[in-house]
Amino acid sequence: GIMDSFFPEASFFTEFERFDRYLDMIKRNGQQIDYVCVCSPNYLHDAHIRFGLKLGCDVICEKPIVLNPWNINSLIQVEKESSNKVHAILQLRLHPSIISLKDRIIKSSSDKIFNIDLKYITSRGKWYHHSWKGDYDKSGGILSNIGIHFFDMLIWIFGDVIDLKKEFEDKSTAKGVIVLEKAKVNWFLSVDYENIP
């Protein structure tokens, strides 16, 4: 993939302790590390971001930055103390069709409220519920694994949240309504094969 095509000589680690040791060695040899990119399971993001900041690096992290909202304030404090920055990646904002949609919405009538039905249904194998992704405490559930991409995109396009109601959530499915400045969205997310039409 990308690693092989562009970074065939990149160091690669599957154990955090070896990565930590390697970075310490680089730093002691006078080399500067500018960025740490966090692409680990959701429940490790907070700790890995803190690690990068304490190392003196800016940190690029996939979603979500933290699983629990009450953890964000202490992470912001660590960021301020480090004088480095944390950058979140939500890639749908960069998709050409999403950018085009946002441009069309901006050019639409300022008082128009859009009605949207968002249904995202994809099946996942048995592995899903046996991995960290199927463990609510480690993943944040379907809303953090899948929903966050859509909610970020919708907020980016249609404005701030006015009201949010989750009607149902279990380990495979979630349903609710989100009211934004320029849209009312009925949403349904599922990784359950039984929900595929």
Model-predicted regions and their roles:
Residues S11-I76:
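Beta-loop-alpha module in the N-terminal Rossmann-like domain of NAD(P)-dependent dehydrogenases
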Residues G1-E9:
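Glycine-rich phosphate-binding loop and adjoining beta1-alpha1-beta2 segment
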Residues L92-D163:
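Predominantly a Rossmann-like dinucleotide-binding segment in NAD(P)-dependent oxidoreductases
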Residues Y35, A47, S74, P96, ...:
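Alpha-helical elements of Rossmann-like donor-binding domains used by nucleotide-donor carbohydrate transfer enzymes
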Residues A10, L55-C57, S82-K85, K182:
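A short helix->loop->beta-strand "cap" motif at the edges of active sites that frequently abuts
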Residues I72-L92, S110-I116:
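Rossmann-fold dehydrogenase core element
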Residues N145, F151-P197:
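Contiguous beta-strand/loop segments that form the cofactor/metal-binding neighborhood of enzyme cores
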Residues N42-Y43, L92, Y193:
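Short glycine-rich anion-binding loops that position phosphate/pyrophosphate groups of nucleotides
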